[in-house]
Amino acid sequence: MTDTSSSSSSSSASSVSAHQPTQEKPAKTYDDAASESSDDDDIDALIEELQSNHGVDDEDSDNDGPVAAGEARPVPEEYLQTDPSYGLTSDEVLKRRKKYGLNQMADEKESLVVKFVMFFVGPIQFVMEAAAILAAGLSDWVDFGVICGLLMLNAGVGFVQEFQAGSIVDELKKTLANTAVVIRDGQLVEIPANEVVPGDILQLEDGTVIPTDGRIVTEDCFLQIDQSAITGESLAVDKHYGDQTFSSSTVKRGEGFMVVTATGDNTFVGRAAALVNKAAGGQGHFTEVLNGIGIILLVLVIATLLLVWTACFYRTNGIVRILRYTLGITIIGVPVGLPAVVTTTMAVGAAYLAKKQAIVQKLSAIESLAGVEILCSDKTGTLTKNKLSLHEPYTVEGVSPDDLMLTACLAASRKKKGLDAIDKAFLKSLKQYPKAKDALTKYKVLEFHPFDPVSKKVTAVVESPEGERIVCVKGAPLFVLKTVEEDHPIPEDVHENYENKVAELASRGFRALGVARKRGEGHWEILGVMPCMDPPRDDTAQTVSEARHLGLRVKMLTGDAVGIAKETCRQLGLGTNIYNAERLGLGGGGDMPGSELADFVENADGFAEVFPQHKYRVVEILQNRGYLVAMTGDGVNDAPSLKKADTGIAVEGATDAARSAADIVFLAPGLSAIIDALKTSRQIFHRMYSYVVYRIALSLHLEIFLGLWIAILDNSLDIDLIVFIAIFADVATLAIAYDNAPYSPKPVKWNLPRLWGMSIILGIVLAIGSWITLTTMFLPKGGIIQNFGAMNGIMFLQISLTENWLIFITRAAGPFWSSIPSWQLAGAVFAVDIIATMFTLFGWWSENWTDIVTVVRVWIWSIGIFCVLGGFYYEMSTSEAFDRLMNGKPMKEKKSTRSVEDFMAAMQRVSTQHEKET
């Protein structure tokens, strides 16, 4: 046999090779992505030494041709019956290009102006905008400026934080080839890759980056193709006549031709980009929660305004007075600073995570990560090292591991570029076999025959230092065994032990290689078996264990075989309920009803042999079941599911496309940083949850109190003071972002019924306290005002104090004294309290200054209200009866949900069948 580079091509290739234009060798071939550069340098140095010593170089003697093409989504079969020796005619190319377009993905640009304007859309924003219009109509320019400033602040912060430079689709395009070599009108020509059409015949050879999907049409063809850009897996895949190839794959070894079956958006990569665009649509989970809260508060504002307007109608109040009442209710009815405070809280958390080498690209992902219940993890490069390593070899009696290793390395390629992953693993492992490493350079390679798909082995003929001629082989264990058996009988015990070991390694997911040699004119000797596997990262098992303790279920999604996936899961302590992704029935091909399929995915520990659509589908099914899902990955193949997941996590070494699609990018290797991220996200969630309870209670407090004050007494707090109350409440609690917060040992979610129940009760207690203050302040005995004071000033101080102190109650997991607030939060609240006190003492924005004794009485009364609030909150936090009353527990799955799942699955199958028929 001869090297692929020097061997003749297939008959069809030979017939057109004379027409091949001069081509430059590609500057780069795809290599093992996770290999360390120092190890690669060592291997290159070793290969140079071997080549310089013996003058043997199995680098391709031919010029590496420009990248070729191949395509995806099936076109009519008659379009694919192109003559491989002649190709398409120029006229046919024009017809097909008109029908299918260029081989490129569609550009979908999002307007930055529209994106910015959308930050002014939402229930809370609408109320703020209405308040700004009212303030302008009343010529209240101070309030108008403050409200507009808050609107711009909220929009500006959100826009900057959510804006991501670069397009995910552009990153996906970078994986595609720029040119292709095709047969047109019987000539082999080089064309831009985007001009390839379905039915084109493309040339494939070492180094070719395939720009389309296609099917191999060269008979007796053997290719090894790196599909890591599609599947993320490190091992090259063997391809033969009739096999499918995919866009962005790279030919590692072999020559042949393929017919294009799909181009542009119809390729696997194109469809992956479409999935990313689809997943990018829709509202985030956190946005939905805030909008839901805003809608309810808006309804309450309208109800309060109806009450006020009705009272004003019977009193025949003037329109200006009614509008001022309306402005006051509108300002206090919704938490105008809610978006800014929660965004600041998450931004501070993101800065902390950055110190832990976790870069947050989408702030709302922090909230989603806190509630994640299922972690879907890619295997290669995420749970494993993405590089093959050799395990303990099995040797027959009388053979040393060094002998086996030396023979295997002698039967290894001497390429520097595009070195086979298995050969690289052997050469890297030489450092563990010093005797074999020292002896290797003393042998002279006479002949080298790369992997033969028929004999399933690699063969090298070498000369020992003593001048002895030795034939070395490594390959499929049973084929190597057959080679030896054809030469002479093997002892039964050796034969049985060898086969048993091969079967054991296969069941454990190892890729085993048999090794044998023949000295001179002697007999073949079976030496043993060398198992290899992509090993788990050193910290992955511990990380997975910690994730489980934090309430996460971990599912593995990998492009590897089921056996390999199960062995990896066994080593990591994951479950071994791993299934082939075919059982997901993509494209309507599954037989399971929708509800049964959802149960199947929910209970599985993972899936093997997956493509991007499978990962996307798994995430989608779990989300439809109500789970918050996180997805980790590092390759182009992971981009759609990273974008679809509630929290997409790109691990260290991820491709640009994966980083762009992810919400959080880890710079540290493996998943260990995710533990800190989970804990931090739950701390941040606790801060946000406590602030939202606090802020809703404040809005309800003022709606109830001011609504009754206006309706019953036909009076209200000054509008300027209302604005200051709203500002003070949010300024003081901005420091909640730095508060000392606990983290939950389980995933946390927005328990909205319980949240509203707590907020309503706290708001009512606050309103009662304010009403008592209002109605008793002028009593001759026991009234708050003793000598002199202003009603507006006293009410402003009482409301400010009790509202500001409420955050100390809602922030604690237990009684308010059980957790000490951070100095930032305590300092901010105290500073606002001092300012509010000065407002009252010196009559700023009120009629008159207030006596110091009156101010002290307000402080004492407010402390009493604070204690009552603390008691109510503690009882609600610890009461199971309150939980049941608020219906905060997750509802059990209803039969109607399963019926909908079954119906949708049936409709999908019908739709797919209809598409095939038409």
Swiss-Prot record:
Main localisation: membrane
Biased composition (Low complexity): 1-18
Cross-link (Glycyl lysine isopeptide (Lys-Gly) (interchain with G-Cter in ubiquitin)) at residue(s): K252, K555
Membrane-spanning ranges: 116-136, 141-160, 292-313, 326-347, 720-738, 755-774, 825-845, 858-874
Domain of life per record: Eukaryota
Listed result of changing D534N: Activity reduced to 37%
Catalytic-site annotation from UniProt: D378
Keyword 4Fe-4S assigned: no
Mode of membrane association: Multi-pass membrane protein
SMART domains referenced in this protein's UniProt entry, alphabetically: Cation_ATPase_N (SM00831)
Intervals, Extracellular compartment: 137-140, 314-325, 739-754, 846-857
Outcome reported for the amino acid change (mutating K474Q): Activity reduced to 19%
The entry's keywords: Amyloid, ATP-binding, Cell membrane, Hydrogen ion transport, Ion transport, Isopeptide bond, Magnesium, Membrane, Metal-binding, Nucleotide-binding, Phosphoprotein, Prion, Translocase, Transmembrane, Transmembrane helix, Transport, Ubl conjugation
GO biological processes: positive regulation of TORC1 signaling; proteasome storage granule assembly; proton export across plasma membrane; proton transmembrane transport; regulation of intracellular pH; transmembrane transport
Name of the protein in question: Plasma membrane ATPase 1
